């Protein structure tokens, strides 16, 4: 049964503008707003963020904070102040040795930065929870099959990761992705999120943590290997409350969407979490608007607890807006109102 419907939102500037947008969200059946808080917002607009959270609460919306694009470790088009200020503490290519424009989340420098970012916002804003938005290693970006191929390069091969690997396994970190490297990357990738989630729950036990991972096959022949594709390891983390999988393009086969959705629910149930599936509410739109209702029904029938869409108004006015952004927004809203049984 779907009991929460979410939309992401970038407008963290003025409370009076956000208030009107929040009312529009409610009119579209939204029960929870995910505030995409950037590093720039944190440094520049922070005095207004608690007021915006308060206004959303006043209007009856739940609020999650998404550290959007933070360190370029999370999904998002935003630039990163951490990377601007740190020429080190970056992910490094295993094949070329190049430093990349992605923070290495295994370094203490980034882990401290990220934890301070989140704990500060939790103290000042009193949100209902936090949303870990597509965390990932920079590489591989292509399909990683058991035969190698386009995804042979991977991260992170920085001095911190290499030392930590050698300290744990007792031999130097290889430059190709062995089973030890895979396990090391999965395990280390969870540390920054687990530690920060634990700190947030120590601050307020009622804070809810949603971890949203890439919607990938992760089977015997094909796996993504970007750090969070081992869904069992993510699902069993004791500090996560909601297991979420990200957007699937409308142009992909319905069976693929169904498979991702059913596996999402299965992992969530296995580890006693709530399940969440995302709809593509920006950039692309279905050829047939009835597909939105069909995919929403697939999620409902599979037992999904929550639906979410990126982003408010279909990305209207941005370079990633859908061709008919407002129509997409309205269609998602119609389906939210149709299926959501709030607090059921």
Where are these regions (language model features)?
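Catalytic domains of carbohydrate-active enzymes, especially glycoside hydrolases
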Residues: 15-42, 124-127, 236-243, 298-307
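The substrate-binding groove and active-site-proximal loops of carbohydrate-active enzymes
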Residues: 5-13, 34-43, 96-115, 174-190, ...
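Aromatic-lined substrate-binding rim segments of carbohydrate-active enzymes
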Residues: 21-22, 35-85, 184-203
């Amino acid at each position: 049964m779907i009991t929460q419907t979410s939309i992401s939102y970038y407008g963290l500037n003025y409370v009076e503008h956000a208030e009107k947008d929040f009312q529009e969200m409610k009119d579209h059946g939204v029960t929870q707003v995910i505030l995409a808080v950037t590093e720039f917002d944190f440094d520049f607009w922070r005095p207004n963020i608690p007021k915006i959270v308060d206004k959303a609460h006043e209007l009856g919306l739940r609020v999650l904070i998404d550290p959007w694009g933070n360190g370029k470790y999370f999904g998002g088009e935003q630039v990163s102040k951490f990377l601007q200020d740190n020429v080190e503490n970056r992910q490094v290519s295993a094949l070329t040795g190049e430093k990349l424009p992605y923070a290495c989340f295994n370094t203490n420098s980034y882990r401290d930065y990220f934890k301070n970012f989140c704990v500060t916002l939790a103290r000042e804003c009193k949100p209902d929870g936090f949303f870990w938005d597509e965390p990932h290693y920079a590489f591989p970006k292509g399909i990683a099959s058991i035969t190698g191929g386009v995804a042979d390069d991977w991260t992170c091969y920085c001095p911190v990761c290499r030392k930590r690997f050698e300290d744990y396994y007792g031999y130097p970190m290889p430059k190709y992705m062995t089973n030890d490297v895979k396990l090391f990357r999965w395990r280390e990738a969870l540390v920054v999120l687990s530690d920060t989630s634990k700190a947030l729950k120590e601050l307020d036990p009622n804070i809810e943590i949603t971890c949203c991972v890439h919607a990938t096959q992760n089977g015997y022949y094909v796996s993504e290997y970007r750090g969070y594709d081992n869904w069992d390891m993510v699902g069993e983390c004791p500090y996560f409350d909601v297991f979420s999988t990200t957007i699937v393009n409308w142009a992909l086969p319905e069976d693929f969407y169904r498979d991702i959705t059913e596996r999402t629910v299965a992992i969530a149930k296995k580890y006693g979490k709530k399940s969440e599936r995302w709809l593509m509410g920006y950039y692309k739109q279905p050829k047939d608007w009835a597909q939105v209702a069909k995919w929403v029904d697939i999620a409902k029938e599979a037992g999904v607890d929550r639906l979410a869409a990126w982003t408010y108004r279909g990305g209207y006015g941005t370079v990633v807006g859908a061709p008919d952004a407002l129509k997409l927004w309205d269609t998602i809203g119609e389906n939210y109102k149709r299926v959501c049984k709030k607090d059921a």
